[in-house]
Swiss-Prot record:
The gene is coaD. Homohexamer. InterPro entries: Cyt_trans-like (IPR004821), PPAT (IPR001980), Rossmann-like_a/b/a_fold (IPR014729). This is Phosphopantetheine adenylyltransferase. Its cofactor is Mg(2+). Keywords: ATP-binding, Coenzyme A biosynthesis, Cytoplasm, Magnesium, Nucleotide-binding, Nucleotidyltransferase, Transferase. Its main location: cytoplasm. It comes from Blochmanniella pennsylvanica (strain BPEN). The keyword rRNA-binding does not apply. Belongs to the bacterial CoaD family. Pathway: Cofactor biosynthesis; coenzyme A biosynthesis; CoA from (R)-pantothenate: step 4/5. It catalyses: (R)-4'-phosphopantetheine + ATP + H(+) = 3'-dephospho-CoA + diphosphate. GO terms for molecular function: ATP binding; pantetheine-phosphate adenylyltransferase activity.
Protein backbone atom coordinates (compact mmCIF):
# COMPACT_ATOMS: atom_id res chain seq x y z
CA UNK A 1 0.00 0.00 0.00
CA UNK A 2 1.31 3.42 -0.98
CA UNK A 3 1.24 5.99 1.80
CA UNK A 4 0.61 9.49 0.46
CA UNK A 5 0.80 12.86 2.16
CA UNK A 6 0.32 16.47 1.14
CA UNK A 7 2.67 19.30 2.06
CA UNK A 8 0.86 22.59 1.37
CA UNK A 9 2.35 26.05 1.58
CA UNK A 10 2.84 29.34 -0.17
CA UNK A 11 6.53 28.60 -0.86
CA UNK A 12 7.33 32.22 -1.76
CA UNK A 13 10.07 31.22 -2.43
CA UNK A 14 10.72 27.56 -1.72
CA UNK A 15 13.66 27.30 0.71
CA UNK A 16 16.13 24.62 1.71
CA UNK A 17 14.08 24.31 4.89
CA UNK A 18 11.06 23.27 2.83
CA UNK A 19 13.17 20.84 0.82
CA UNK A 20 14.59 19.37 4.02
CA UNK A 21 11.05 18.65 5.25
CA UNK A 22 10.17 17.00 1.91
CA UNK A 23 13.25 14.79 1.89
CA UNK A 24 12.83 13.76 5.54
CA UNK A 25 9.08 13.16 5.05
CA UNK A 26 9.93 10.61 2.37
CA UNK A 27 11.31 8.38 5.15
CA UNK A 28 7.68 8.07 6.27
CA UNK A 29 5.63 8.59 3.11
CA UNK A 30 5.96 6.96 -0.31
CA UNK A 31 4.44 9.85 -2.25
CA UNK A 32 4.33 13.55 -1.40
CA UNK A 33 2.06 16.10 -3.03
CA UNK A 34 3.75 19.49 -2.81
CA UNK A 35 0.75 21.79 -2.97
CA UNK A 36 1.59 25.41 -3.76
CA UNK A 37 -1.14 27.65 -2.38
CA UNK A 38 -2.65 30.86 -3.67
CA UNK A 39 -3.18 32.38 -0.23
CA UNK A 40 -5.63 35.29 -0.07
CA UNK A 41 -4.15 36.36 3.28
CA UNK A 42 -0.66 36.85 1.85
CA UNK A 43 0.79 39.02 -0.89
CA UNK A 44 3.43 36.81 -2.48
CA UNK A 45 6.38 38.18 -4.40
CA UNK A 46 5.92 35.53 -7.08
CA UNK A 47 2.77 34.48 -8.90
CA UNK A 48 1.28 31.06 -8.25
CA UNK A 49 2.50 29.92 -11.67
CA UNK A 50 6.08 31.05 -10.92
CA UNK A 51 6.08 29.35 -7.53
CA UNK A 52 4.82 26.09 -9.05
CA UNK A 53 7.58 26.23 -11.67
CA UNK A 54 10.22 26.84 -8.98
CA UNK A 55 8.87 23.96 -6.87
CA UNK A 56 8.87 21.60 -9.86
CA UNK A 57 12.44 22.55 -10.74
CA UNK A 58 13.64 22.23 -7.14
CA UNK A 59 12.10 18.76 -6.76
CA UNK A 60 12.76 17.45 -10.28
CA UNK A 61 15.18 14.80 -8.98
CA UNK A 62 12.71 13.61 -6.34
CA UNK A 63 10.50 11.14 -8.21
CA UNK A 64 8.21 10.73 -5.21
CA UNK A 65 7.10 14.40 -5.32
CA UNK A 66 4.20 15.72 -7.39
CA UNK A 67 3.85 19.51 -7.51
CA UNK A 68 0.67 21.43 -8.26
CA UNK A 69 -0.87 24.80 -7.48
CA UNK A 70 -4.24 25.37 -5.89
CA UNK A 71 -6.68 28.08 -4.90
CA UNK A 72 -9.03 26.38 -2.47
CA UNK A 73 -9.21 25.21 1.11
CA UNK A 74 -6.48 22.68 1.79
CA UNK A 75 -9.05 20.23 3.11
CA UNK A 76 -10.97 20.37 -0.20
CA UNK A 77 -7.82 19.68 -2.21
CA UNK A 78 -6.99 16.76 0.06
CA UNK A 79 -10.42 15.25 -0.59
CA UNK A 80 -10.00 15.68 -4.36
CA UNK A 81 -6.55 14.05 -4.26
CA UNK A 82 -7.76 11.38 -1.81
CA UNK A 83 -4.99 12.21 0.65
CA UNK A 84 -5.61 12.00 4.39
CA UNK A 85 -2.22 13.02 5.76
CA UNK A 86 -1.03 16.60 5.96
CA UNK A 87 2.65 17.44 6.50
CA UNK A 88 3.52 20.63 8.36
CA UNK A 89 6.94 21.92 9.34
CA UNK A 90 7.50 23.46 12.75
CA UNK A 91 10.33 25.87 13.47
CA UNK A 92 9.27 27.23 16.83
CA UNK A 93 6.49 27.58 19.38
CA UNK A 94 4.55 30.18 17.40
CA UNK A 95 4.51 27.85 14.38
CA UNK A 96 3.14 25.12 16.64
CA UNK A 97 0.39 27.33 18.05
CA UNK A 98 -0.69 28.39 14.55
CA UNK A 99 -0.45 24.88 13.08
CA UNK A 100 -2.40 23.28 15.93
CA UNK A 101 -5.31 25.63 15.12
CA UNK A 102 -5.20 24.59 11.47
CA UNK A 103 -5.00 20.91 12.39
CA UNK A 104 -8.05 21.23 14.63
CA UNK A 105 -10.11 23.06 12.02
CA UNK A 106 -9.12 20.50 9.38
CA UNK A 107 -10.26 17.73 11.75
CA UNK A 108 -13.53 19.59 12.21
CA UNK A 109 -14.15 19.39 8.45
CA UNK A 110 -12.85 15.84 8.11
CA UNK A 111 -12.03 13.53 10.98
CA UNK A 112 -10.09 11.34 8.53
CA UNK A 113 -7.36 13.97 8.12
CA UNK A 114 -4.24 13.59 10.23
CA UNK A 115 -1.57 16.26 10.51
CA UNK A 116 2.03 15.14 10.89
CA UNK A 117 4.30 17.79 12.37
CA UNK A 118 7.94 17.67 11.40
CA UNK A 119 10.40 19.65 13.49
CA UNK A 120 12.78 21.74 11.41
CA UNK A 121 16.41 20.72 11.37
CA UNK A 122 18.40 23.13 13.56
CA UNK A 123 20.17 24.75 10.63
CA UNK A 124 16.82 25.74 9.07
CA UNK A 125 14.87 26.49 12.26
CA UNK A 126 15.23 30.27 11.89
CA UNK A 127 14.63 30.32 8.14
CA UNK A 128 11.47 31.58 6.47
CA UNK A 129 10.61 32.72 2.96
CA UNK A 130 9.81 36.14 4.40
CA UNK A 131 13.25 36.38 5.97
CA UNK A 132 14.94 35.33 2.71
CA UNK A 133 13.16 38.14 0.87
CA UNK A 134 14.09 40.67 3.55
CA UNK A 135 17.76 39.66 3.47
CA UNK A 136 17.78 39.93 -0.33
CA UNK A 137 16.02 43.29 -0.25
CA UNK A 138 18.93 44.74 1.75
CA UNK A 139 21.60 43.16 -0.43
CA UNK A 140 22.41 40.17 1.77
CA UNK A 141 23.39 36.79 0.40
CA UNK A 142 20.55 34.31 0.10
CA UNK A 143 22.27 31.53 -1.84
CA UNK A 144 22.69 29.51 1.36
CA UNK A 145 18.93 29.48 1.91
CA UNK A 146 17.30 28.81 -1.46
CA UNK A 147 18.19 26.89 -4.63
CA UNK A 148 20.61 28.82 -6.83
CA UNK A 149 18.24 29.05 -9.79
CA UNK A 150 15.76 30.97 -7.60
CA UNK A 151 18.32 33.43 -6.16
CA UNK A 152 18.54 35.62 -9.27
CA UNK A 153 14.74 35.49 -9.70
CA UNK A 154 14.25 36.84 -6.17
CA UNK A 155 16.77 39.64 -6.68
CA UNK A 156 15.29 40.55 -10.07
CA UNK A 157 11.72 40.55 -8.76
CA UNK A 158 12.67 42.70 -5.76
CA UNK A 159 14.44 45.20 -8.05
CA UNK A 160 11.35 45.45 -10.25
CA UNK A 161 9.11 45.86 -7.21
CA UNK A 162 11.40 48.55 -5.81
CA UNK A 163 11.33 50.46 -9.12
CA UNK A 164 7.52 50.38 -9.15
CA UNK A 165 7.36 51.59 -5.54
CA UNK A 166 9.70 54.53 -6.26
CA UNK A 167 7.07 55.85 -8.66
CA UNK A 168 4.62 56.15 -5.77
CA UNK A 169 4.56 59.55 -4.10
CA UNK A 170 3.66 59.92 -0.46
CA UNK A 171 2.03 63.06 0.97
Amino acid sequence: MTIQAMYPGTFDPLTYGHLDIIIRAHKIFDKIFLAVAENSQKHPLFSLEERVIFAKQATAMLDYVTVFGFNDLTINVMKKKQVNILIRGLRNRSDFEYEIQLAKINNYFSNEVETVFMISTDIWACLSSKLVKEIAQYGGRIDHFIPNFIVEKVIEKLRNTEKKNKNISFL
